[in-house]
Amino acid sequence: MSALKYWLWLTELRGLRNQTRLALLRHFGSPEDIFYADEGEILLTEGITRDQASLLKDHSLDRADQILAECQRLGYQILTLHDAAYPGRLENIYDPPCVLYVRGQMPAFDEECAVAVVGTRDCTPYGVSVAEKFGYGLAAGGALVVSGLARGIDSAALRGALRAGGRTAAVLGNGLDVVYPKENRYLYEDVAAAGA
């Protein structure tokens, strides 16, 4: 069975905070080892409560199978914390996501100058103009422009970077298959074509 299924199982368990998942990974080494551990072994993990350990009794891999099939159908790549392609800069933050879903070409975050441009959704026309200029200037200078896909400053920075022919990456909080806001559908497609 694919080790990736166990990563998806772990990330899809409801009621576990990401910090709990990371503590379990530090203790056991892999999601597969967590999957097959008994409750007594799980309780030896620092900071794990009995309630949290009981959540790990759910050994259904159905949701993981669904996610794998959907990602394959849509052409999405799945990266785990243990994958060589997982960005080291992201891995070294306090609370790194266990799994990344990637649409497009994963930028070489650790090798490129990556600059995040984020801001308010409810911005003035001046704010939009400045964000587009920032995105354009950064991309023209060779930087990878990273932002959310939210309306306002985030979208403006990405549009500016794309206008400059630069590389972009959008970090989405709502899943790859959900474009929000809907008016950014074309921007979503353009960002995936110019990065991830």
Segments (PLM) and residue ranges:
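Glycine-biased, small-residue-rich flexible motifs in mid-sequence functional cores and linkers
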Residues: A3-L4, L81-A196
